[in-house]
């Protein structure tokens, strides 16, 4: 393969990957607790093994910087502070983690985030019908009953809150974070961390910077177009060279 064509084609493929990541970021501007991601590429001029070179060049990173805090005055809205995470079950029953603290209660009395069931510190959490709830800063869920002269609090359960290093996490297509494969054995049974703190009646907004992502998208589109022109020019030059060769022979 012509070296210029290969390099331009490889660059174009990577730009398409970048565009997909940016498009996903922009689609989640309004998603509570969403962390934007970006691809970094290491330039490698080894042309002997094209497939191997391409796979090793791409690495995805995440921006874990906190999003803006939004006051909601809703008891079931939470901000999970610092490097704490809320543990939930995905559709396959696998434990996953999120910063999205917009909790709802489904018809079965289960607490959910984006329709994923929350994991309790001591088993499943079952919320009775028509109760006033309060979630303490340590994740304990309480039922609040008001009498004429007093307020009675009774514990229903506790959220599973974990503390994880950002480098150990990977985000999948469903938007949830999971432990990387090489950390599964090390952290096989992640326990509740009682030191993790939450803030109720607030939500953490997406940390996506729409202006930056739009600028990057436009820049990538221009670079992609430039690479397509280079490929086209190389094809034309090859065709002209072949025609001249045929004429001379």
Curated annotation (Swiss-Prot):
Subcellular location: Bacterial flagellum basal body
Gene Ontology BP annotations: bacterial-type flagellum-dependent swarming motility
InterPro entries for this protein: Flag_bb_rod_N, Flagellar_basal_body_rod_CS, Flagellar_FlgE/F/G, Flg_bb/hook_C_dom, FlgE/F/G-like, LlgE_F_G-like_D1
Any one Pfam family match given in the protein's UniProt record, by short name: LlgE_F_G_D1
One term under GO cellular component: bacterial-type flagellum basal body
Alphabetized UniProt keyword annotations: Bacterial flagellum
PROSITE patterns linked: FLAGELLA_BB_ROD
SUPFAM superfamilies recorded: Flagellar hook protein flgE
Domain of life where this protein originates: Bacteria
Family, per entry: Belongs to the flagella basal body rod proteins family.
Quaternary structure note: The basal body constitutes a major portion of the flagellar organelle and consists of five rings (E,L,P,S, and M) mounted on a central rod. The rod consists of about 26 subunits of FlgG in the distal portion, and FlgB, FlgC and FlgF are thought to build up the proximal portion of the rod with about 6 subunits each.
Protein name: Flagellar basal-body rod protein FlgF
Species whose genome carries this gene: Buchnera aphidicola subsp. Schizaphis graminum (strain Sg)
């Amino acid at each position: 393969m012509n070296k210029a064509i290969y390099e331009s084609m490889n660059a174009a493929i990577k730009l398409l990957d970048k565009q997909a990541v940016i498009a996903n970021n922009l689609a989640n501007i309004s998603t509570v607790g969403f962390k934007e991601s970006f691809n970094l590429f290491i330039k490698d001029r080894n042309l002997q093994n094209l497939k191997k070179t391409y796979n090793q060049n791409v690495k995805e990173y995440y921006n874990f910087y906190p999003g803006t805090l939004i006051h909601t005055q809703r008891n079931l809205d939470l901000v999970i502070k610092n490097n704490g995470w809320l543990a939930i079950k995905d559709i396959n029953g696998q434990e996953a983690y999120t910063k999205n603290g917009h909790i709802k209660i489904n018809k079965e009395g289960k607490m959910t985030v984006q329709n994923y069931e929350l994991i309790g510190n001591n088993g499943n959490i079952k919320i009775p019908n028509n109760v006033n709830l309060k979630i303490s800063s340590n994740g304990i869920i309480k039922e609040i009953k008001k009498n004429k002269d007093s307020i009675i609090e009774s514990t229903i359960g506790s959220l599973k809150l974990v503390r994880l290093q950002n480098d150990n996490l990977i985000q999948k297509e469903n938007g949830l974070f999971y432990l990387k494969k090489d950390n599964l054995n090390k952290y096989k049974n992640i326990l509740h961390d009682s030191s993790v703190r939450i803030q109720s009646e607030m939500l953490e907004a997406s940390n996506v910077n729409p202006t930056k992502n739009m600028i990057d998208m436009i820049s990538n589109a221009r670079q992609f177009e430039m690479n397509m022109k280079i490929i086209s020019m190389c094809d034309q030059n090859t065709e002209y060279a072949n025609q001249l060769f045929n004429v001379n022979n």
